[in-house]
């Protein structure tokens, strides 16, 4: 080795090379002399390359020996206290390995983290150091291998858009958790990486991994769903004879009685609902859904469910194994008692099929179009006629036996539109279409030719047509946001314009009396009349939703999302108190303990503070240029901790009841992005989780990390939202990849714990949840990853938010 090191140092002895380069006589030397010198240099370089290879080999041997030594030390630690050997005997070349250049590939909780501020720290591996060198920090060996992305590989904003995330548990047998009674910790494994969690001293003697946790005595019941899916779905808004308005969002069909302010929910689907149809009896309803993937990787096929809107009982399920990707259009027949149902799926051929739904038999199917299909409906007087429309097509289908025969709509002198967007029928049986050119076209009954045209009925596309009971036609425009009524001769009667804040009209339905219901692309449901104003009865977010904050003393909560909206909701009245448009996509939020202000963090590193009463901006700051995943005020209201994707926690001093902020500093030490934060009851300590499963502790007032286990293990935490920790590790399913659980929340009474996962499920556990594979009550409703959960101030309700499904669900604790 000494020869190797001498050769290694000679690698940097460049005096002879510099002398050669600076020697003026070299220019006069013969070509033979130059060739000799080059040959000599090449020989020297080759020798030095050989020496480098020798060094690499020696260093690899040192790393191997180091791993063996640390494994032996870990075994000794488990067996009990032993006298530590001298450092030089145990780790002869520890300082060489600790330069941040090479790390062993085997995870070791004893190695110092190679991240930024800790790179040059030399930590001898003995038992005593093991207990103080951030012993709850995971140091996965693969971290340096991905040093190109030091902030970790997982981006919380990029989670899958559905419970059909395709995640599968690890195929290899997962490691079981281990318990060290001597040290008083439990070690669990996520993706094979150890996560060490120390328990309170008073639990060490009585704790057993084999003990079984119990289910909570309380349960959840879905009470209210906020939001509506109008951004990419059509014909999904109807009024039922019960006085309820029916629509859907996520995997829930909502039946909303506006007058009585009550909701009922059909929850038979297991993934996104995409279409809805009401039977002529106005009681039976059909809904179609997308394909999905269950938690264990099994395929969940798209299908149609037919159910009773009074009892909410499922009557029939059709199409399992037949539909592909999703069911996008459905309709009941009208003239034969509604015994037939047609459906179009989202396969490449957009297959149109006709079913006897009561027998669950398919009567016929045919390739409809290579392009998108927007609507399919039976003719009101001829059961055998079906009309479909979409991109570049309008087709009239005739059901004859087991076949469907097609006639294409002939536009003739009329310019063919790019999209035929909607279809309805007149009292005399004419077919009426609205298209992307803004024209209303009337197709004579029984023909595929245009009998009348209303040119330029709207500026831009016509997204919706609705034939009212009195024969009045109502059309809804997209670009112009206008609602126009037409008489039987297609003469304009009334015109109303929907305010820009509500967005383009997506669907139109008839309400009670002269009331019109409107669904918009910005996920509003409006009601009003053609001669009056339209007011929202339902609204929701329009883009991915992550931020959730609960008011400390009122039944209110705030949500914020990538749609740049922050909305304060009244959980009793089930309506927004106010809505604020901010300049950047929002990711996180947190209420000041006084409830007077609320902080909102964004994807850009900026954060805002708003007055809760007036929604006025109090202050705005910027910390870094990456997303702020957590905004958490201390219990005494004197500090604000901000967890960022730049791996730092920014600490601000707070005064004047949340209106004045002074930067204290930042806590640096994590080697991946911050995911969760919690304050101690006395506001003196902070615990944080990161994207690579680290658990670190801090004194935020000094921005210093706390590495003493004896200091941190008995801290009482004001909240428990960290997904990693002794009191919550039982929430993790066996074989989890460490990203399955997005949010954790402990109830204020400290008896319940809720989680939201990547499979659209909300779980309710007993707290503390410190037994492996703890049982839970499981609730469905979200179709996307559940991004956040939190209990209202009095623990009477739980709020959950969906990511891509943009829904907010309010669960009553019973």
Curated annotation (Swiss-Prot):
Region (Disordered): 77-185
Ranges occupied by WD repeats: 260-309, 314-357, 362-399, 408-445, 449-488, 492-529, 534-571, 577-612, 616-654, 663-700, 708-767, 774-813
Ranges of biased composition (kind: Basic and acidic residues): 142-152
Transmembrane keyword on record: no
Domain comment as written in the entry: Contains a tandem atypical propeller in EMLs (TAPE) domain. The N-terminal beta-propeller is formed by canonical WD repeats; in contrast, the second beta-propeller contains one blade that is formed by discontinuous parts of the polypeptide chain. The N-terminal coiled coil is required for association with microtubules.
Job description of the protein: Modulates the assembly and organization of the microtubule cytoskeleton, and probably plays a role in regulating the orientation of the mitotic spindle and the orientation of the plane of cell division. Required for normal proliferation of neuronal progenitor cells in the developing brain and for normal brain development. Does not affect neuron migration per se.
Subunit and interaction comment: Homotrimer; self-association is mediated by the N-terminal coiled coil. Does not interact with EML3. Binds repolymerizing microtubules. Binds unpolymerized tubulins via its WD repeat region. Interacts with TASOR.
Family to which this protein belongs: Belongs to the WD repeat EMAP family.
Protein name from the UniProt record: Echinoderm microtubule-associated protein-like 1
Gene encoding the protein: Eml1
């Amino acid at each position: 080795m000494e020869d190797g090191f001498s050769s290694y140092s000679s690698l940097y002895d460049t005096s002879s090379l510099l002398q050669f380069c600076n020697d003026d006589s070299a220019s006069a030397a013969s070509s033979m002399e130059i060739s000799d010198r080059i040959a000599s240099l090449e020989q020297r370089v080759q020798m030095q390359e050989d020496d480098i290879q020798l060094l690499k080999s020696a260093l690899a041997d040192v790393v191997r020996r180091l791993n063996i030594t640390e494994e032996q030390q870990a075994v000794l630690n488990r067996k009990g206290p032993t006298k530590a050997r001298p450092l030089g005997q145990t780790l002869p070349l520890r300082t060489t390995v600790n330069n941040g250049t090479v790390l062993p590939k085997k995870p070791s909780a004893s190695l110092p983290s190679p991240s930024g501020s800790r790179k040059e720290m030399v930590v001898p591996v003995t038992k005593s150091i093991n207990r103080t060198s951030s012993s709850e920090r995971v140091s996965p060996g693969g971290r340096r291998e991905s040093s190109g992305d030091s902030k970790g590989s997982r981006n919380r904003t990029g989670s899958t858009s559905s419970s059909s995330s395709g995640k599968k548990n690890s195929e290899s047998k997962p490691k079981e958790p281990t318990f060290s009674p001597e040290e008083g910790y439990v070690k669990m494994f996520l993706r094979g990486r150890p996560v060490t969690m120390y328990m309170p001293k008073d639990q060490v003697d009585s704790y057993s991994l084999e003990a079984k946790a119990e289910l909570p005595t309380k349960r959840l019941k879905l009470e209210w769903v906020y939001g509506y899916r109008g951004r990419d779905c059509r014909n999904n808004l109807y009024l039922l004879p019960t006085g309820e308005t029916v629509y859907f969002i996520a995997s829930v069909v909502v039946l909303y009685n506006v007058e009585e302010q009550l909701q009922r929910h059909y929850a038979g689907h297991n993934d996104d609902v995409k279409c809805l149809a009401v039977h002529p009896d106005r009681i039976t309803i059909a809904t179609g859904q997308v394909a999905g993937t269950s938690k264990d990787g099994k395929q969940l096929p798209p299908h149609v469910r037919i159910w009773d809107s009074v009892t909410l009982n499922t009557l029939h399920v059709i199409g399992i194994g037949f539909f592909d990707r999703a069911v996008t259009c459905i309709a009941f027949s009208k003239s034969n008692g509604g015994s037939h149902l047609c459906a179009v799926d989202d396969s490449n051929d957009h297959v149109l099929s006709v079913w006897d739904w009561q027998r669950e038999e398919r009567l016929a199917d045919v390739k409809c179009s290579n392009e998108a299909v927007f609507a399919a409906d039976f003719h009101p007087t001829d059961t055998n006629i079906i009309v479909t429309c979409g991109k570049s097509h309008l087709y009239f289908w005739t059901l004859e036996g087991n076949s469907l025969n097609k006639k294409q709509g002939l536009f003739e002198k009329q310019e063919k539109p790019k999209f035929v967007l909607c279809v309805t029928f007149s009292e005399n049986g004419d077919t009426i279409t609205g298209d992307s050119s803004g024209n209303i076209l009337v197709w004579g009954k029984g023909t595929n030719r245009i009998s009348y045209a209303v040119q330029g009925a709207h500026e831009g596309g016509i997204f919706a047509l609705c034939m009212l009971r009195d024969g009045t036609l109502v059309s809804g425009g997209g670009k112009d946001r206008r609602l126009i009524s037409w008489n039987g001769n297609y003469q304009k009667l009334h015109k109303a314009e929907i305010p820009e804040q509500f967005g383009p009209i997506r669907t139109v339905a008839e309400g009670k009396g002269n009331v019109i219901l409107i669904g918009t692309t910005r996920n509003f449901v409006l009601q009003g009349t053609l001669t009056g104003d339209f007011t929202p009865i339902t609204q929701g977010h329009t883009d991915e939703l992550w931020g959730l904050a609960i008011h400390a003393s009122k039944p209110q909560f705030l949500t914020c999302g990538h749609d740049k909206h922050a909305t304060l909701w009244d959980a009793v009245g089930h309506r927004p108190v106010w809505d604020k448009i901010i300049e950047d996509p929002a990711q996180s939020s947190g209420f000041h303990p006084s409830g007077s202000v609320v902080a909102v963090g964004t994807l850009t590193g900026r954060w805002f503070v708003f007055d809760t009463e007036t929604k006025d901006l109090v202050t705005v700051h910027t910390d870094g240029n990456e997303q702020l995943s957590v905004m958490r005020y201390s219990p005494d209201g004197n500090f604000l901790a901000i967890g960022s994707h730049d791996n730092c926690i920014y600490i601000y001093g707070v005064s004047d009841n949340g209106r004045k902020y002074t930067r204290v500093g930042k806590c640096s030490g994590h080697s991946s992005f911050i995911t969760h934060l919690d304050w101690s009851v006395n506001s003196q300590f902070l615990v944080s989780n990161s994207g690579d499963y680290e658990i670190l502790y801090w004194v935020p007032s000094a921005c210093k990390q706390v590495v003493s286990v004896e200091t941190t293990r008995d801290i009482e935490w004001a909240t428990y939202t960290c997904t990693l920790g002794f009191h919550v590790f039982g929430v993790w399913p066996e074989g989890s990849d460490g990203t399955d659980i997005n949010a954790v929340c402990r109830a204020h009474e400290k008896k319940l714990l809720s989680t939201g996962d990547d499979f659209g499920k909300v779980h309710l556990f007993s707290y503390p949840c410190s037994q492996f594979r703890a049982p839970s009550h499981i609730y469905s409703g979200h179709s996307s990853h559940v991004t956040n959960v939190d209990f209202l101030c009095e623990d009477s309700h739980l709020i959950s938010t969906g990511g891509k499904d943009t829904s907010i669900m309010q669960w009553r604790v019973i």
